[in-house]
Each structure stands twice: as C-alpha cells, then as structure tokens.
C-alpha cells in the first residue's frame, strides 16, 4: 500500500501543473474502491470454498443449484430452507454469428482449437452471450472464483471434485433382519432410491459444468477450463453416462458435447475474409511442414508448393470455401503427428503428377511436329496424297493419344488437398451435424483430427486397390464413406477401438472382394453363351458372339473354313497341326470336292471354327468340353435302330433322286456316327474327346469293307478316304445279286461278333444295319464313284445333305418315341403277368376241394398247378422219412421265395428232355405231340405215347446212343437260345408228372429206363401237370419199376455214376441259386420201348416230358404256376406260409417195396392204379408262426 501511494504521489507531481485537485481526489477514490473490491473478492473466495467443501462432503443435487445461482449473480440471495431448490438446466450452447464488421463482438461461442497461436486467439477471442437473462455481456466475476475454489478443494482432499461427485457411492451393507422378505424389499427400495438420487446428482453436476463453459469470460478461460477437465480424467467418467436413460442426464450430456464441438464449427466457418491473417499463417505453416528440405528438386516458392499439394487455383476463397480453416488445420495435424505416412502418400502422388505432365508435354510436341509435317506434305504432294498423309498422321496422333491414355491409367493420381478437404467435410457430416451421443467425442480433445488421419489413410488404401483413373475418385470416396459410416454406428468408445473395428471391416471387405473375383473367374465361360444347342465353344471368325439374327450362324462360314475346303493340299491351320495326311487324288475328285464346297458352303461341325488355343485361354475349359461330350453321346446312343438309321440317311437328310427307285441300283452307304466328321487340324483329337473310340482307325474299316464285299461277283476297288472332304469312296458293280448280299450280311454279322474290344458294340450294330440297307441300294454304273463320308453329309455331285439342328431334332424325337413305345410294351407285359397271378389265386381257391375229392377217379390230367392238400389220408403203417437237414435251406429267403420247387434235380432233368423232344418233333413234322396239355385229347395222347414206346425211330435211337456214350450236359440248339433269353427273367420249375397207362396194356410194354445227366439251362416250356394225389401214386409206381430194372443194368449204372460224380461240381456251380435236394444225383430218364410195337416219336408216359429221377422224392415246395400248357394260361401258384408245410419228401424203404412188389406186379395188367399202394399223408406239420 505504501508503494502504491508513493507511485501516485510521483505521478501527481510529474503530471501537468494544470491538473486540478479534484482530479487527484477522484483518482484516490478509485484506488480505495479497488482495494475494497480486493478485500471483498478474498472474502468471497473463502466463502465459496466453504460451499464447495460442503457440496463435496454432502453430495446433494440441490447444492449444485446453489452453485449455479452463485455463478450467474454477483450477490447472494437468502434461501428458504423449507423450500427445495429446483433443478436449473444449463443453457443451450450459443451459435456463432459471422459478420465481418462485428466479428469480434458478435461471435458468441468459444472455439476449441489446440493449435491456435496467441495472436490469433486475441484477435478472434469470442465473448459469450448466453440465452439466459442473468448472463450479461461482461465477464462473470464468479467464474474465476468458483474455479479457484474447486481447485483448492481438490488439492485439499487429494481427489478431483467432479470425479468425486460423478462416481457412484459404495453401497453400505444393510442390517440383517429376521424377516428375509422384508429385507429383500428394503434392499430393492434402497437401490432404486440411490439410483434416482445419483442420476439427479449427475444431472446437477453436468449442468454446473455446462454453466461454467457458457459463462467463461474469454476463449482462453474456456479452453483452459476444458483442458483441465480432460487432463484430470473427468471426460472418462462423463463418457460412462452416455448410455443413461435419465432425460436430464442425456440433455446435459448433449449440451456438453455441443460445447466440445463448437470449436470445430467455429473453425469451419472461418473464411479468409473474416480472418485473413490466420488463414495465411496456417497455409505457410502447411507448406513448410510438407516440404521441409529446400535442396534438390523441392519447390522453393509457396505457389509451387501449393500446386504440388493439389491447389488448382490461386483463389484461396474458392479453395477454402467448403471447409474454411478446419481443412488446413487437419492437414497440419496429420503432417505434424504422422509425418512418415503423410510424406509417403504425398511423394507418391507428386511422382505420378510429374510423370503425367511430362507425357502431356511430349504429346503436345508430337502434335506440333505432326502438324508441321502435314503442312509440308500439303505443299509438295497432290490433293489426294495430302489427304492420305493427313489421315495417316491423324491416325498416328490417335494411337499416341491412346497409348498415353493407357499410361495415364497405370499412373493414376489424386489431388492431395482435394482429398483432405473432402474427408474433412465427410467426418463433419457424420459426427458434427448429427444430434446423437458418441463416446468417441468424450474420449480425447483431438478426436476429430485423429479420425481425419485414419480416413485419409483408408482412402489411399482403397485407391491403390481400385483406383485406376480420375473417374474412380467418386466410387472410392463412396466406399470410404460407407466404411466410416458402418463403424460409426458401432459407437466405438475410443480411437483405439475405432482402429480395431476398422481392421476387422477391412479384412472382411478384402476377403469378400477376393472371393467375388474367384467366383467370377470360376463362373466365366469362354466367349459367353453358345449359340449352338450342341454346347460348342462360342465365337466366329472375328471372335464375336453374333447376337443379331443375320450373324447368328456366321461363325460357321468364316474365311478360314472356306480356304481349308478349297485347298487341295493338307493345310495346317493356325494353332493346330494336320495329323492325318490325305492320299493323292485325281483331278476329277478334286473338282468334285470343290463343286461340293461351292454347293454346300457349310461345315459339318462347328468345332472347326474354334481352335485348341482358344479353348485353353478360357478360365474354365472343362465345362464346355463336358457339355459337348454329353450331348454327342446322347445323340449317338439314340441312333441304334435300323428305322432311325434309314430315316437319317434318306428321309431326314433330304436325298431325293429318281434314279434310286430301283432297289438293286444305288450306292452303298456306310456312316459311322461316333467317328469325327472331318479329320485334320484340331478335329483329329476331338473324336477321342467326344466319346468315340480312339483305337478305331479307318484302315480297319477298309479291311471290313473288303471282307464284306468279297462274295460279290464283280469286286469293287478298296475304299479310299479323302481327308479334304472327310469321305470314303467305294466302287460297287451293278451285277451284285441277292445271294451275294445275303452272304455279305452273314459274313459281316460274324465279323461284328468277333470285333476287337476297342470297337464299341454300338458301332458293331451300325455295321450290321448298314449292310441291310446296302442290299437294297446298289449302283448300276460300274465306273461311278460314290463318296461316303463318315458323317451325315452325303454328296454324289447331284444332291447334298446339310447337317443342321433340324435333322438332329428329328432323329432325337423319333428315338424318344421308339423308347416310349418300348416302355409301353414292357408295361403291358408286366400287367399281363400280374393278371395271371391273380387268376391263378382264384382258380386254386375254387378248384382245390373238387380236385382233392376227385383225384382217385379222375381219368384226365388237369394242367393247372396245385399244392399238395394237407388233409390227404395216409396208411396207418406209413412213416415219413424226416432225416433231411432242413437247417441248410430254412432261411427266410428260401421260405418266402417263389422259386421253391419239387426236387430241382428232377425238375431240371425234365427241362432237358422236353427240349430234346421238342427238337425231334420239329424235325419229323409231327404235330400230334405238341398238344399234350389239352384235357379234351388225353386218351388220344395216351395211345400215341404207347405207340411211341413200342416203335422208336432210327433217328431217336441214334440220339439215345449218343446220349449214352456222352452223358455230359449237352448244348442247347440255336433255336432254343431265343426262348431261353425270353424266359430267363422268370425262374420256372415243373412238377413231377407221369402218364396214365391203358388198362389193356401188358406189363411187358413198360419201357426201360436210361439215366443220363441233364442240362441245367434247358427250357421249361411245355411241361404237363397232374393233381397232387395222382402224382404221388405215379411216383411210387415209377419208383418200383425203376428199382426192378436197375438190378439188370448195374454195369450201365456204375459207369453213369462215375460220370455223374465228375459232373457234380459243374452242376452245383450252375445251380447255386436253386435249392437242390440232398444226396440225390441229377439224372435224365429216357423211357425206351420194352417190347415190340409201333414206333413213336416221343417215348414218355404222357407224350410230354419223359424225365424222372432215379429215386424220386415228393415236393417240399409249392408248385409254381408258370408251367402251364399253350392252350391254358393258369395263374401263378400260391405261396407257402412256412417251410414245414412244404415238407413232402417221402422215402419208401426197399424192404417195404419188396413186400408189396408181388401185389403191384400182379395188378398192373388189370389196373395200374389198383395194385400200387396209395400214399396218403396223415397230418401235415403245423406252422410255428
């Protein structure tokens, strides 16, 4: 105080002498007032610290309302303690008014720029103007007092005041009560109350912070206060309430976010007209930082530096119109913080920029030289020459420009400053103009500048991958915006989490782009879609697609093909080699081939137009090859019928000529569908690729043709192949007769059966069918030559056949119709078999009882099959033999199969004898034995059978002697092969049948028995049936007769047994699928005449099948219904429910037969059926099922 007084005295004494005393007194009063104010501020600071300490300790929301009232007024007002102080929200952050004349006085909100200089801050320091009436235009006195008091209390308690208020308090442990329900309810209520109170406390604290920012007296005070909050970690705590649902808290957070971004808004609105000095200082700083070295090729002036940075004009207002000072400030931050990345990107773009300028200068010089040359040429040459020179020079200029454009595409660049300003606007639009809360804004103060650096590096990365020219600037910018927007909505909490999320997005994006490229390459086809239905590789002579109707098939008429057809020598096309060398031709044949090409003007195969090199260049060549192979194989397999072949050669191919009306005149035609249509060039290898046999050659074909035509009287010359036309020529004389054609057919059929395995069976069938067609079309001219190509093109000089889609379509349509008809025929056959099975079931049900009752008195044989009845009575002393091993054949498949038969050894022996008898009947033209199964003519057939026993013919005796000498399985005749194939689908087994002898016949007439091995594969047709009881009786009688005759023929039996043992293995192997009865060798029985009498053809008892086993046994399986006569069509048999019901094998011991032998021998003369004991079953086995 004393120093101040002395200074004032010195001032007074040094002042002007005219200074009056009143002025001195006034100055002294002002000094006194200032002293009083200082005293008052000290007292106010002490009282404010007391209040802040009270708020720090009590943590009540209403106390922040008191602090807000202290901040907005300079005087204290009494507060009623009984009235609660209401919440006072903070004012909305003020906007910035840009006015050039009053920019300093009317700018309202502070600007948050960390890189501004003191000079710029003093010139553009804003003055706060709040919406609240209490806030005046002058600096607030309480802002500094409250700030000092809060800092003092924080130092006193060693913890930040705001962090202490905003943190959630630790909940104190509740007292344990006896009632747990009341305890839980109290805990919930306390938690709810504490949450609500804490939200109010947070809202009050944030409102006080916003009020402090709004009442800052200067920009310096505003920025200082904001940086203190950030440095002390208050923003980290405030960021945790971004997800709060309390409306007051969210409102205050939004206001605090607005305060943080108001500085960014102010910088964006600062133009060169408002603050020219700051703008120029920032530009100079950017140029110095971007080009720190002045040596070498670095620019020296700011104009050159700004041009390299991407500034297009000198008008800074236009350049900075979109971003203002904010764009330059972001670029300075990027250069200062990440100089290495910044310098690398900038140098790369400058290098591309310089190269393009050099190329442009060279182009301008070349154009000048060309123009001078044009002028000289115009003076020296005529007008026509001048025009030609001008055209040539212009074309050279166009080529140079095109080359330069290609180089420009490779050396694409972008404007560095343009990208910086655009990305600044992009981030400003995403975050600043949005009204949502983002945690990244509360993370750090330079969040906006950090996002700018990340986005700039992202743009450069995408540009290096996808940017090829200046036109790609907009797509790359859109992709950058999409990535930033995607990350924005994930709401990352910090810049570090933003970078991690960006890395994940980029990895996903690059992997997807790579996958899409791979899919496009895999799905791409060579030349696009094909115009041909055959799936031929696309492309004509020019490589185009031929989309229009006129150009659709122009690829089949290219110049390359025409030159190939017109040439007389072997021509190696581009990218291919001629493998097949053609033989020399006469001039006549060459002229004829040229006339043919002039008439047709169409190749046989579109494969001629595409070379192997074109297919190899395609990314996926195997798809086209696979498609063509499948279609060609389909068309070749469907053309196997003779009618289709005739239509393809005559009707569908358009061969019309009046000279071919004579069937014996015409040319022999031979066409092979699987051989390539044209040989030479690339098509030599296409035959093996498209399914044709690679080992088949035309030399073999010529040898076959020579052998086929050897039987013709006038032999023609050997066929010759012409590689130019792809045709075979053959001379055939007109004197070929029908005999020669027939011999040729037989010889070629034998050749087709003995062809090499390399030739496909379809090719063999084609050769046989073509021989049938050649017999009807033989030529009358001896010297005429018919060119026969291995394709569908046939041209004899008068007519031509064009290969087109119509003929292919017709042939396929006919083949499909034939296949449909075959399917219908098969369906009819299956349907008829099903109907037969149904009828057999009905017949068995209706005729079962009648046949069982009338079996003893029935004199005629019923051909319908029957199951042995289970209620058949047997003698009391009869004991069936059950020593068979049923476990071997007792599986489920054997029980349920329809192929279970009477001792299959006996049944198959019947088959062989029936085939032999049918053969003998056909040779001697005797038809009386063919109708053995008709019930109306049984007596007549019995008489014929007896006559056949008495009078054997010499031919039959010879056959029997051969069978005795060679008791091996004999081959079937050729006539029975077809029958075997037709009946092979259904396995049939006959029942044992025997003939009824006449009552007046003597015992001496009983025929002898010859036992021979049978053929397992004989046909089973034409076997008669008998009812079950009659078959049992006849089996016993035959068994007795066989045992008597065997005693006199022991030597013959021993020899035959040895042969049977040798053939047992072969018989078992051939009948593995058929169940065979155990321990009974398979024999064939031929009943030979035992005395004199008329000789008959058949030596069977029933004039039918004459084969029975040496030791017959009864059936253990049901009788199948397949064995029916030609006149009757009995249905299929009924399936047995169990194998135990099928046990009908009965063995009669030799002792019992010897006891009854006298009875049987004495009664045969009177009646065969009387003397032979009747075997009857007592009871069938019950099923266990």
From Swiss-Prot:
PROSITE patterns: ELMO. Transmembrane segments: none annotated. Residues 275-488 form the ELMO domain. It holds the Pfam family ELMO_CED12. This is ELMO domain-containing protein F. GO terms for molecular function: GTPase activator activity. Residues 829-841 have a biased composition (Basic residues). Residues 94-127, 176-194, 361-406, 587-613, 688-699, 733-760, 767-780, 853-864, 912-974, 1053-1072, 1096-1109 have a biased composition (Low complexity). Residues 88-133, 176-196, 361-409, 566-628, 642-805, 819-868, 883-989, 1044-1114 are annotated as: Disordered. Residues 648-665, 721-732, 781-790 have a biased composition (Polar residues).
